[in-house]
Amino acid sequence: MIYHRGVPDASFLDLPQRPAKPRTTGLTHVLDPGVGPAAAADVLGAGAAHTDIWKVGWGTAYVDRALGAKLALLADHAVSACLGGTLLEIAWAQGRARECLAWAGEAGFGHVEVSRGTVEMTLREKRGLIRLAAADFAVLAEVGSKAPGEQFAARHWPLEAISDLDAGASLVVTEGRQSGTVGTFDAAGRVRPDVVEAVVTAVGRKRVVFEAPQTSQQAWFIRRFGPEVNLGNVALSDVLSVETLRLGLRSDTAAVARPEDAAGSEPA
């Protein structure tokens, strides 16, 4: 029996088997709004085994004087740091995308997000930025609109997702923002199933990270696709909560604890 600080590891339940890190499915991607190293250490102390990608949100990396200490912590816990897409968008708009990417590489980021929700950018220009970034990073390409009340029809999402992957993105990320009320969701935070199914049918569930900041949204995706669905924009305080949802240790998803119910029926 393995003990951690005097407490034995719990191993008495039959639960879905989760792959160990580094994994390619069942990813938990968290959104860091600008916490310091001490807060990051608290999250990692409890949940590093359940955290795969740590997005340093928006442009916070540019002004965070403790960024180096935080990125070192992430590396020590085998969590990949991701540069938020807004910073790269602004750099691109100023003609400084190469400088931004060079800085991100030197800082220690392993992932970068490529988005087009802040500045005007055509799909052709986005593909070019993805190709540029993919030379040195794993690219998360965001699809969908950030604008409240603006809903792209379901038929438009697969076209951008396929284009982004063809340009070299490792994964596509469906827009949901920190609020969970845009993009893949309506203004009340309800999932738009037609959008989800259109994207998954086009590129497969394993190549999509679904931004899902709300517990009800996370539970919906796990019930639909099983515990190995990739979830993004998870709050730092919700890392363990999401893992319990994956394992069926919350009433919202208790059925996934039965192996015959965990696989889902989605395209691979």
Model-derived segments and spans:
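Conserved N-terminal beta1-alpha1 strand-loop-helix module at the mouth
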Residues: 1-73
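C-terminal alpha-helical cap/extension of soluble enzyme domains
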Residues: 4-16, 197-268
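Active-site mouth loops of central-metabolism enzymes
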Residues: 24-38, 57-61, 82-96, 142-156
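Hydrophobic faces of well-ordered beta-strands that scaffold small-molecule active sites
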Residues: 25-31, 51-56, 81-85, 112-114, ...
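Active-site-adjacent beta->alpha loops and helix N-cap segments on the catalytic face
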Residues: 38, 61-74, 90-99, 116-137, ...
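Catalytic cores of alpha/beta
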Residues: 42, 96-102, 152-166, 213-227
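Generic structural signal for hydrophobic
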Residues: 43-47, 74, 103-107, 132-133, ...
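Glycine-rich phosphate-binding active-site loops on the catalytic face of alpha/beta enzymes
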Residues: 56, 111-118, 166-181, 228-245, ...
